[in-house]
């Protein structure tokens, strides 16, 4: 039982480190061949939006491209997070059925 408690504590410590590292990650989503760029951090907060001046006259297209860039950024940050979790969790024994907190 003591061994299981120590292992659980190690898992908890590693997960805390993973969460801290993930919050520092960044990803840029793009659409319109790079005409719209959105940068998100690991907590999925938007850091910036870049819009090419050529898009300012077409509101509907601009709106669609912003949505597409945001969705691309979400996809990219999710992939980076999953890779990070997989790389760390492969080094520890996680009990079957254990769900990650994020």
UniProtKB/Swiss-Prot annotation:
Coiled coil: none annotated. Gene3D superfamilies: Nucleoid-associated protein YbaB-like domain. Pfam families: YbaB_DNA_bd. One of its GO terms (molecular function) is DNA binding. GO terms for cellular component: bacterial nucleoid; cytosol. The keyword Thylakoid does not apply. Keywords: Cytoplasm, DNA-binding. It is found in: Cytoplasm, Nucleoid. Homodimer. PANTHER family: NUCLEOID-ASSOCIATED PROTEIN YBAB. HAMAP family: DNA_YbaB_EbfC. Binds to DNA and alters its conformation. May be involved in regulation of gene expression, nucleoid organization and DNA protection. Belongs to the YbaB/EbfC family. This is Nucleoid-associated protein WIGBR5260.
């Amino acid at each position: 039982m003591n061994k299981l408690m120590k292992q659980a504590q190690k898992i908890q410590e590693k997960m805390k480190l993973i969460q801290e590292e993930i919050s520092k990650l960044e990803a840029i989503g793009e659409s319109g061949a790079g005409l719209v760029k959105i940068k998100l951090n690991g907590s999925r907060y938007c850091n910036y939006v870049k819009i090419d001046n050529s898009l300012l006259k077409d509101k509907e297209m601009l709106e669609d491209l912003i949505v597409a860039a945001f969705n691309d950024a979400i996809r990219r940050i999710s992939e980076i997070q999953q890779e990070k979790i997989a790389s760390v969790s492969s080094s520890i024994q996680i009990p079957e059925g254990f769900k990650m907190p994020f």
